[in-house]
Amino acid sequence: MTVKERITALRARMKETGIDAYLIPTDDFHGSEYVGEYFKCRKYITGFTGSAGTAVIMQDMAGLWTDGRYFIQAADQLEGTGITLFKMGEPEVPTVHEFLKKNLTQGRCLGFDGRTVSAKEAAELEKMLDENGVSLSVDHDLAGDIWENRPALSCEPVTELDIKWAGESRADKCARIRKAMEKKGADLFVLTSLDDIAWLLNIRGGDIHCCPVVLSYLVMTKTEIRLFANEKAFQPDVLEALEKDGVTLFPYDSIYEYVKTFKKDKKVLLCKKKVNSRLVSNIPADTRILDEENLTLLPKATKNPVEVENERIAHIRDGVAVTKFIYWLKKNVGRIPITELSAAEKLYEFRSEQENFIDNSFDPIIAYGKHAAIVHYFATPETDIPLEPSGFLLADTGGHYKEGTTDITRTIVTGPTSEEEKKYFTAVLRGTLNLGAARFLHGCTGVNLDILARQPLWEMGEDFKHGTGHGVGYLLNVHEGPNSFRWKTVPGGNAVLEEGMITSDEPGYYREDGFGIRHENLMVCKKAEKTEYGQFMCFEFLTMVPFDLDGVVPELMSVRERNLLNDYHAQVYEKISPYLNEEEKEWLKDATRAI
């Protein structure tokens, strides 16, 4: 079926079930940013493939809301579908909730699958729409009803993460969380975020593409841990090890019945921003719910010394692969046929040669020329274009290694570029260097520091429509909270930067139909000196790959900025050159020369 045919079929099901507007978020049953094929209902209905977006279907309109990363991509993919694009955050553009409040009147009904909407959002919708006399219907997966040949739920094999990689045993992690439960006065802890469960139990899977997680729910009490997952994914030795640490396996969907048995005298801790609304609504009304952040959130984000040291190793391995790729690319572009897709395959080949490489940490963004202006562009056979010996290639890629997860962006000069392009290339690089060199008092958040990355562009009256940085998991999700860099404050999204947190530093500049630039390093937060003013903090770059000096205008940089770049490049040469052949090493020596 075409997108138009799918929407027509969905509207027919809406009529049958008395639903006037149907909400389709991106989420799976666990609030994941990236989801497995089974859960891609929004993509199936709208044809939009971006990782963030919400669709609303009514009888007389269809709309898709997405953020600035995807404006260009969404406009292209929605063309001819009859779906209206709502550019989130733009002036005069209503939010999804504002739109629903305005367009749903007395007696109307909003529907959604309650497993794909958080309890927090569902409560907000119910309160807002109740004022209009609008009802909710949350038990129907209407998109699933019309989805022909829907993929099955993933059930990839589960493995254990050895303590030499994790740095802390499963038993010790569970004991830590139980202590936190005790402090909060909680009798039960309901955990549904897939990366949190994988971190807590030191298990990894493959149920989401490029995200080594296991489709599961978890309930911890003072005496037991119930894991709800597909038993077929667990080998006997993994099950035995889990059982030894007090973890008992139950069928994946059975949690919805289990939570109905919670006693009224028990206090249940869960995060309504993360747990889906159907699960929370199944908990008896007289049970007291403590709505708190997941107790695993900060422990997961603050990497322990073993994890940090392993990440340094992972980034050297990754640095070797990406450096070899850049050398190969600059040597061969214009000489042999290279396209965006074939370049991505070549980079994967270089990564695969590295010890302990597992997989990409996300689908590679290899974007040449005007494609680089699409912040999260993914080449397909239909969009793939050849690389030419001119302009920029933006390569935003990453890998999973046993030692950790990487995420790196380099804007590579493939040939002659204009002075204007170099001006912006240099401005963005200055932002990356300045943020990475920050020293700050403990207690600062990413909001406090974000201006260091944006200032060079802001001075030019320019900006970029995405966050400056995100947390990164340890052999887990490449996007992880709560740490981030952004200039706007958001409720509950302004976490203090703690020792051991790994965060990306990735300002950019994008000119539609022109070019795109992004420079990204991962960095770990560390303690610096302690004075009478308090504990100072700093960052250490983990990523070890040269920035392309062919795009840099040294005269546009301060002496301090040039020194920062030179010092970084000296580190890159020292750590990466021992793993290169003589030709590559000679090239890297020039690529990291002092300016």
Model-derived regions, located:
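Active-site neighborhoods and metal-handling regions in enzymes and metal-associated proteins
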Residues: 1-595
